[in-house]
Amino acid sequence: MSRRCDLTGKKANNAFAVSHSHRRTKRLQQANLQSKRVWWPSGNRWVKLKLSTKAIKTLEVKGLEAMAKEAGINLNHY
């Protein structure tokens, strides 16, 4: 189970945690992923996807079909 958005492909970013004395240690900035059921009208069923919050906002504008086509995923596998 990867921490990656199903539609946008967003994943963790490598960054530094910087202390007051400016010592830097590596850390991960995880994407804000949410497990979400989305209605798929042409499939006439719910599809459970792991989406970033940015993808959820974009989904409301573009729609599931268009975003899945851009991402190159087959919704029948979800």
Swiss-Prot record:
GO terms for cellular component: ribonucleoprotein complex; ribosome. It comes from the Bacteria. InterPro entries: Ribosomal_bL28, Ribosomal_bL28/bL31-like_sf, Ribosomal_bL28_bact-type, Ribosomal_bL28_sf. Gene3D superfamilies: Ribosomal protein L28/L24 (2.30.170.40). Pfam families: Ribosomal_L28. GO terms for molecular function: structural constituent of ribosome. Keywords: Ribonucleoprotein, Ribosomal protein. GO terms for biological process: translation. Belongs to the bacterial ribosomal protein bL28 family. This is Large ribosomal subunit protein bL28. It comes from Trichormus variabilis (strain ATCC 29413 / PCC 7937).
